[in-house]
C-alpha cells in the first residue's frame, strides 16, 4: 500500500469515527422537529425545512389527522405562518407559528376552521377531520 493510500485510509477512519460527535451530527439530531403541546393539550408537529425534517415528518404523519401545508403559488414552501384552529363552537384550540411548511396536528374528529396569516395576508379554510385517516389543507400565497 502506498503512503498516499495509507493517509487517505487513515483520514477516512478519523472522519468516520467522528460522525456521531461532529457538529454535522449534532445539527442533524436537532433538525428533527419534536412534539409540542399547547395549553389545551393538542399535540402537533411543525417543520419540514430540509430533507431530514421532511423525512422525519413523513415517518410520523399517520399519527396526525390534520396536515396543513403553506407555500407560494410558484411552489416555494413557507414557514413562520401564524396558525389558529377553531372548533365548531368558535373556540381556538390551537394557536402557533409554523416552524416550516408543514403542520401536523391530532384533533378529535369534527369540523374545524383553520385561519392562517403570512406577512399580513390572511386566509381561512374549513375542514372535516375524519374518524380514520387524515384531512389535508393547503394554503397558497
Say what each PLM segment does.
Residues 110-116:
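A short tyrosine-centered beta-strand micro-motif
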Residues 93-98, 129:
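Short beta-strand segments within Ig-like beta-sandwich modules, predominantly Fibronectin type-III
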Residues 100-106:
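Short, surface-exposed beta-strand/beta-hairpin micro-motifs centered on an aromatic residue
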Residues 82-93:
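Short amphipathic beta-strand segments in non-cytosolic proteins
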Residues 108-109, 131:
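Surface-exposed loops/turns
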Residues 16-24:
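C-terminal segment of classical bacterial N-terminal signal peptides
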Residues 24-81, 121-141:
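Primarily secretory-pathway and cell-envelope proteins
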Residues 1-10:
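Bacterial N-terminal signal peptides that target proteins for export
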Amino acid at each position: 500500500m502506498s503512503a498516499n493510500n495509507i493517509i487517505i485510509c487513515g483520514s477516512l477512519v478519523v472522519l468516520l469515527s467522528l460522525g456521531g460527535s461532529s457538529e454535522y451530527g449534532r445539527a442533524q439530531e436537532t433538525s428533527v422537529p419534536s412534539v409540542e403541546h399547547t395549553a389545551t393539550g393538542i399535540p402537533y408537529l411543525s417543520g419540514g425545512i430540509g430533507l431530514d425534517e421532511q423525512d422525519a415528518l413523513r415517518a410520523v404523519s399517520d399519527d396526525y389527522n390534520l396536515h396543513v401545508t403553506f407555500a407560494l403559488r410558484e411552489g416555494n414552501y413557507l414557514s413562520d405562518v401564524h396558525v389558529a384552529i377553531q372548533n365548531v363552537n368558535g373556540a381556538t384550540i390551537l394557536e402557533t407559528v409554523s416552524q416550516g411548511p408543514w403542520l401536523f396536528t391530532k384533533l378529535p374528529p369534527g369540523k374545524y376552521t383553520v385561519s392562517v396569516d403570512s406577512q399580513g395576508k390572511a386566509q381561512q379554510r374549513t375542514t372535516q377531520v375524519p374518524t380514520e385517516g387524515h384531512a389535508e389543507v393547503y394554503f397558497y400565497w
